[in-house]
Amino acid sequence: MPDSVRAETGESVAKARVHELAKELGITSKDAVAKLQELGEFVRSASSTIEAPVVKKLRDAFPDAVAAPEAAAPKAPARPAPKAPAKPAEAQASVKPVETQAPATPAAAKAAATPVAPAAPAVKEQKEGSAARPGAGGPRPGNNPFATSQGMPRAGARAEGERPAAAPASGAGRPRPGGPRPGAPRPGNNPFASSQGMPRSGGRGDGERSGGPRPAAGSGGPRPAAGSGGPRPAAGSGGPRPGAGSGASRPGGGGGNRPTPGMMPNRTERPAPAGRGAGGGAGGPGRGGGARPGGGAPAGGGFGKGGRGRGGTQGAFGKGGAGRGKQRKSKRAKRQELEQMSAPSLGGVSVPRGDGNTVVRLRRGSSITDFADKIEANPAALVTVLFHLGEMATATQSLDEETFALLGEELGYKLQVVSPEDEERELLSTFDIDFDAELEAEGDEDLQARPPVVTVMGHVDHGKTRLLDAIRNSDVVAGEHGGITQHIGAYQVNHVHEGEVRKITFIDTPGHEAFTAMRARGAKVTDIAILVVAADDGVMPQTVEALNHAQAAGVPIVVAVNKIDKEGANPEKIRGQLTEYGLVPEEYGGETMFVDVSARQNQNIDALLEAVMLTADAALDLRANPNKDARGIAIEANLDKGRGSVATVLVQSGTLAVGDTIVAGTAHGRVRAMFDDDGTAVTEAGPSRPVQVLGLSSVPRAGDTFFVTGDERTARQIAEKREAADRNAALAKRRKRISLEDFDQAVADGKVDTLNLILKGDVSGAVEALEDSLLKIDVGEGVQLRVIHRGVGAITQNDVNLATVDSAIIIGFNVKPAERVAELADREGVDMRFYSVIYAAIDDIELALKGMLKPEYEEVQLGTAEIREIFRSSKFGNIAGSIVRSGLIRRNAKARVLRAGVLIGDNLTVDSLKRVKDDATEVREGFECGIGLGSFNDLQLEDIIETFEMREKPRV
């Protein structure tokens, strides 16, 4: 219907479903959805409801389809037709209720064949009696959001007034020129019905029952029963039922309104059974009587509540209804039903299972929801399954790899957690960055020689930094606390080899056991490893670990036997020990070069550098392409008060220049300045050159890769996605795990004690190493350690506030707080500890964790006494006259009573102890005494009294 006509009739464009509009416009639902998406409207499916403005846009998009049904609408007189004469008896018969239920009579059939115009006075009487609103006899098509066609007949459909044998309708039922037609009802809401108002295949239509024509769709005449003009059988109401569309505005009515005949398919007419309503099933007893304003008759069963304009429901308990048959199940419903039947049940829920070989790939830190999306399962069901397996987690909580493996094994899936390298590759592929393809595209003409990168590795205090100091002729050790390297240093030196000045890049790694990850990173970026072994100490644990890192990285090793100037030095012993690990010296017929050096005396330093250059030239192809965007790795990073984030990076390929936009781990930014290891400003850095970079948004972690991007927006997006992935992985790693067996005990005992820490340090590598070492501390199941925040730089006010909220301890590693921050921490009672050597921090935290543990007590036997006599006292109870057989008896000690080896009384206390007549603190072996055990009086001769005390057991 055009909007102009709607405006005339006072109607508004209502909501409608997409498939209903498509049917009205004569197009397919798919075309309608596609057109709406073209118009910029988001529509999920053809059953979605769209607002009135969107309805108008769709109608305007198909003007031809709208005009066609309007052209097919019947022409009707502009004014009501004169009322046709009717017999008074027939009019009374059409409205008078019947007391008893009876089949339709021939007179009723005859009355049905007469014109329906006389029904108008009856409706008028009903309106006056029930105070119904004018026009409530039928629904207004424009306002019914559930109507199939919104009052628009299909093109070519037969109009209601043109049906054969139908008399002219009354004035109340005649349509105005271009006026609306009643819309088709929505299927009923009776949940017990098998048909739900759907038409049966080959069934009879609503308006095609035998016995004569119905009243006009818009007529206000009485509702005929069984196709007759007689009253409805067994209707409990005292008045007539309203006309045919009255049920459309209320759910729960009897038969409800009928679809417009023009919207119904042509079917073979069959006679309707007697006693059945023309528009619905048999009316149930006790139906509410009278018309309700605005919505026809009240709902069945006497409940007068109406719905929001829904169509009429079916008959009572699904009988009859609108005469529609059972709807066939859709393919989707059948598939879901089949899956539910075939899916196994675990813990009361059905979850689709794999065949044991189904591989599911998940990212680090994935949640149950991510896993559920992969296998098309309900996350809540997986939470239930996990609970029955002894693990508790929420649907959005990040899980670790072990938990996923447990869940996957139970459900028949092989879960593969994507490695960080694959995860990084997938992330960069979303930005069209493929480094592997770039390397394959490079030819030999693009590659140029580059300096070797040498990593100095070895056990703690074997002289690695002293050796590097001798090479650089600078004092590096003086800057390290405790003589232990706690940073990764990168330096570049010049060496004359065969008359040519060659550059060598050195990386100094820590030797302390806490810095395993930093040593592994050093081995990963290196070309040659120098293994430093002290001639007096020999091979130590970190020596073997460094050797394993170098061998795993596949880099050649040069052994520097240091401290040969000390007494007791035995270089030959070192060679023999390293032979066991596969490092055979050249003089023994092997391939490993051994050089005896003294870093303190600067002995054989040149020989060591010469060995490095010979190894590089003989075993390695050291070339890189300098004519491209730089890529490399962050060696270390720190937060400088004046310069901000400062990262030491090693360029591996390409050339890094000032002004380039780079991404380093979760940090990004534009390079504002670069400095070499001497502090000299440089404008660009080629392959194998270490430089300090200023301008990053945050402090990258040691070992993070960096590369140059085209613009800052891309750099920021990559950094944010990396940060989100790292955060999920950290949450999964930090997740508290508690089994069902321990859950009840944990609830009974209270929360598990947790020591919260905030770690701040001067460089990121040291903070990371400290965190890893602290998380490895295991002092029992009763105490847990949690690092709630870590960062690089001075301790700030935000750190103190966070520690206040979470009752955390702040650990400062080579950093101090500002005076104002220290005052705030003192005022809030926040404990701050400061360390410059890493193992001191580890020892203190371990002792603190042990102090948080609940004390363990052990029973210590004190002595035994045998009862010789029993003295009864009304004031003190029974007193045991005893002789001490072993040990001693002490007042207030715990006691138990044994009779012939059987425990009689336990957890007693020695309340009184007398020696002769005097009170005694303790009585030793061989002496007699009187022992009072309080209210315990079950004592006999020859009973044994054992005394003991509970002493706190020291933590190991």
Swiss-Prot record:
Residues 458-465 are annotated as: G1. One of its GO terms (cellular component) is cytosol. Residues 236-257, 276-324 have a biased composition (Gly residues). Residues 68-357 are annotated as: Disordered. It is found in: Cytoplasm. Residues 325-334 have a biased composition (Basic residues). GTP binds at residues 458-465, 508-512, 562-565. Gene3D superfamilies: 1.10.10.2480, P-loop containing nucleotide triphosphate hydrolases (3.40.50.300), Translation factors (2.40.30.10), Translation initiation factor IF- 2, domain 3 (3.40.50.10050). Residues 449-620 form the tr-type G domain. It holds the Pfam family IF2_N. InterPro entries: EF-G-like_DII, IF2_II, IF2_N, P-loop_NTPase, Small_GTP-bd, T_Tr_GTP-bd_dom, TF_IF2_bacterial-like, TIF_IF2. Residues 598-600 are annotated as: G5. It comes from the Bacteria. Residues 562-565 are annotated as: G4. Residues 86-123, 141-156, 164-175, 212-235 have a biased composition (Low complexity). The keyword Amino-acid biosynthesis does not apply. PROSITE patterns: G_TR_2, IF2. One of its GO terms (molecular function) is GTPase activity. PANTHER family: TR-TYPE G DOMAIN-CONTAINING PROTEIN, TRANSLATION INITIATION FACTOR IF-2-RELATED. One of the essential components for the initiation of protein synthesis. Protects formylmethionyl-tRNA from spontaneous hydrolysis and promotes its binding to the 30S ribosomal subunits. Also involved in the hydrolysis of GTP during the formation of the 70S ribosomal complex. This is Translation initiation factor IF-2. The lineage of its organism: Bacteria, Bacillati, Actinomycetota, Actinomycetes, Micrococcales.
